[in-house]
């Protein structure tokens, strides 16, 4: 039977000093010997997805104490990608993921905590905590802050749904009046919660369900709805049960590496493809697999992208549906139910409830269950009232959306497309692969050929688009924005947004070794690996070179002979220390970012640290 980790600091006469300090935090004699459970919160007033989390830690802590554990809360940082977007702040977003993972490891190992409840929500916080969970491999449950309600406003006598991306597009569209732009801005983000479409935050919180690390409804129940409180309370109670199963019953199925195993990663990727999740999820799942020491690659993802259909289409891929609509249609579990009936899932994997995925589908899929409480749970809907308070309303839809022919979630026979919403491409310009969100690509753009228009920074690309230098038919190439080259692998939401604002959304393709926001749609291909700064072919592309993109065949080709590429490579190498660096970019880089860049791998490895290099440095 495993010994409680916390016994290191709570047992024995030689730990009198540590116990004295524990007593100063409120612990008493009866607490020593109970499991100490870390409540890992991420409250901040900078981020709407986290602004309502201040009291959530103590809500969970109360449930832990009531169930027989000792709860100790601490906080991580949280970066808002939307606010950091379009300026140097975005350089810090992806590195913050790894900083969060490290900070959780530091706190949990320094204080010998026995288990964790991770209260996350937005883009880099959920994956950062997930990486830490896999690294530490102690019992854990994820519970997120929940999605924002979709915005609504009246334009041209019509009520339309809105989200953050609409505000960005219309704000840069010269044909939109100041009055309408202001209306959209004021209505796009009406409540606390993660932005209302299938962007990165909501994608990751949905994947936490599919991995078995979060409770049913975690990815889709609105932040404002009263029913979400039960997820926090249940997480606090259930983590004590998980902890007992491991430490008292020696049940290793309670550990995250045995829950989020390779088969669970398969299920999560199937969900991701079926719901057209953010391309960032590929980066984060690869990083999670690395931390769990699971051999899971972009090749595995590519195989699934060819056989998994798209069963759910949500903003930004369509204006019709947002996360509140996904929840009404049965949420993540109902999508998994359709995938299971299509024979695509591994349903015998365990979860934090102590059951299997098959059990969860049988109980929570709204097309299968007769449980009226579960049906009521999925009828939880928006109130349409501006607020930053959690659990502030209890509105419900009159009916569920169980229409699997024309609804938000479809069955296999009525899929939005037979191939899913994400695809991995490869070719001489991306030898180790690149990623596109096919859910947001129109059918007439699945094959595209055009001349390269080169930019060596996102800033230059934005200026080029807005100044009219980019024309229809071009492939906009933004390079040296990868994990190492940025550094930090910026999101390219502004270039894609401004292409749409200038009427070029379907007339141009965009290719980058950077990444894209979950709010991106259109022919936007990111994560080109190897990146330019790591000797990738994308660094050798010259102005006017023809690039051919073929999503159905999963190919992307720079139409330049191998002989010419070798000549260009030799010329690049001859530059010595200036090789594989942008020619004219002026960008101050802090020591914190230099530290990240020194060890960063390309996107096909999840942009995690280069472990081989790190081991070599330490061994020296």
From Swiss-Prot:
Cofactor note: Binds 1 [2Fe-2S] cluster per subunit. This cluster acts as a Lewis acid cofactor.
Active site: 517
Reactions mediated catalytically: (2R)-2,3-dihydroxy-3-methylbutanoate = 3-methyl-2-oxobutanoate + H2O; (2R,3R)-2,3-dihydroxy-3-methylpentanoate = (S)-3-methyl-2-oxopentanoate + H2O
Binding site for [2Fe-2S] cluster: 122, 195
EC number from the UniProt entry: 4.2.1.9
Name under which the protein is recorded: Dihydroxy-acid dehydratase
Gene Ontology MF term list: 2 iron, 2 sulfur cluster binding; dihydroxy-acid dehydratase activity; magnesium ion binding
Pfam families attached to this UniProt entry: ILV_EDD_C, ILVD_EDD_N
Modified residues (N6-carboxylysine): 124
The protein's assembly and partners: Homodimer.
Cofactor: [2Fe-2S] cluster; Mg(2+)
Biological classification of the source: Bacteria, Pseudomonadati, Pseudomonadota, Gammaproteobacteria, Alteromonadales
Annotated residues for binding of Mg(2+): 81, 123-124, 491
Keyword vocabulary terms for this entry: 2Fe-2S, Amino-acid biosynthesis, Branched-chain amino acid biosynthesis, Iron, Iron-sulfur, Lyase, Magnesium, Metal-binding
Origin: domain of life: Bacteria
Gene Ontology CC annotations of this record: cytosol
């Amino acid at each position: 039977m495993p010994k409680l980790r916390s016994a290191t600091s709570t047992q024995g006469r030689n730990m009198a000093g540590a116990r004295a300090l524990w007593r100063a935090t409120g612990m008493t004699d009866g607490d020593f010997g109970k499991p100490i459970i870390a409540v890992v919160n991420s409250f901040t007033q900078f981020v709407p997805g986290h602004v309502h989390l201040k009291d959530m830690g103590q809500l969970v802590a109360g449930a832990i104490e009531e169930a027989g554990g000792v709860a100790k809360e601490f906080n991580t940082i949280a970066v808002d990608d939307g606010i950091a977007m379009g300026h140097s702040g975005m350089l810090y977003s992806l590195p913050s993921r790894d900083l969060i993972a490290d900070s959780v490891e530091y706190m949990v190992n320094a204080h010998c905590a026995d288990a964790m409840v991770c209260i996350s929500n937005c883009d880099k916080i959920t994956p950062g905590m997930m990486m830490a969970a896999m690294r530490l491999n102690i019992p854990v449950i994820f519970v997120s802050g929940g999605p924002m309600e979709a915005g609504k406003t009246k334009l041209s006598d019509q009520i339309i749904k809105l989200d953050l991306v609409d505000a960005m597009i219309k704000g840069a569209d010269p044909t939109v009046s100041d009055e309408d732009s202001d209306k959209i801005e004021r209505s796009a983000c009406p409540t606390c919660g993660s932005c209302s479409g299938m962007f990165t935050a909501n994608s990751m919180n949905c994947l936490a369900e599919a991995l078995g690390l979060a409770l049913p409804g975690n990815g889709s129940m609105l932040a404002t709805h009263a029913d979400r409180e039960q997820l926090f309370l249940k997480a606090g109670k259930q983590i004590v049960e998980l902890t007992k199963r491991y430490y008292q019953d020696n049940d290793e199925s309670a550990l995250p590496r045995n829950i989020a195993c390779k088969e669970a990663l398969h299920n999560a990727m199937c969900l991701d493809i079926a719901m057209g999740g953010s391309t960032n999820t590929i980066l984060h799942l690869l990083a999670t697999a690395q931390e769990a020491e699971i051999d899971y690659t972009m090749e595995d993802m590519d195989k699934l992208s060819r056989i998994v259909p798209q069963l759910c289409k949500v903003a930004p891929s369509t204006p019709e549906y947002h996360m509140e609509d996904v929840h009404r249609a049965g949420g993540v579990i109902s999508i998994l139910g359709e995938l299971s009936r299509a024979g695509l899932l591994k349903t015998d994997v365990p979860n934090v409830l102590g059951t299997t995925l098959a059990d969860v589908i049988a109980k929570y899929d709204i097309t299968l269950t007769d449980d009226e409480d579960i049906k009521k749970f999925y009828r939880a809907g928006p109130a349409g009232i501006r607020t930053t308070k959690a659990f502030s309303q209890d509105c419900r839809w009159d009916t569920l959306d169980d229409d699997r022919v024309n609804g938000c979630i479809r069955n296999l026979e009525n899929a939005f497309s037979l191939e899913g919403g994400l695809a991995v491409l490869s070719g001489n310009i991306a030898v180790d692969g690149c990623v596109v969100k096919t859910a947001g690509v129109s059918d007439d753009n699945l094959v595209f050929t055009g001349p390269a228009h080169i930019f060596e920074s996102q800033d230059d690309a934005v200026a080029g688009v807005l100044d009219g230098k980019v024309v229809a038919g071009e492939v906009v190439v933004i390079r040296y924005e990868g994990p190492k080259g940025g550094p930090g692998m910026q999101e390219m939401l502004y270039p894609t947004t401004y292409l749409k604002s200038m009427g070029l959304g379907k007339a141009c393709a965009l290719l980058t070794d950077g990444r894209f926001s979950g709010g991106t749609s259109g022919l936007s291909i990111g994560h080109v690996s190897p990146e330019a700064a790591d000797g990738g072919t994308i660094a050798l592309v010259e102005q006017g070179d023809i690039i051919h993109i073929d999503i159905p065949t999963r190919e992307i080709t720079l139409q330049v002979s191998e002989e010419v590429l070798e000549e260009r490579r030799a010329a690049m190498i001859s530059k010595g220390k200036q090789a594989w660096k942008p020619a004219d970019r002026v960008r101050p880089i802090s020591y914190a970012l230099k530290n990240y860049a020194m060890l960063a791998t390309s996107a096909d490895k999840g942009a995690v640290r280069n472990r081989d290099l790190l081991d070599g440095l330490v061994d020296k």
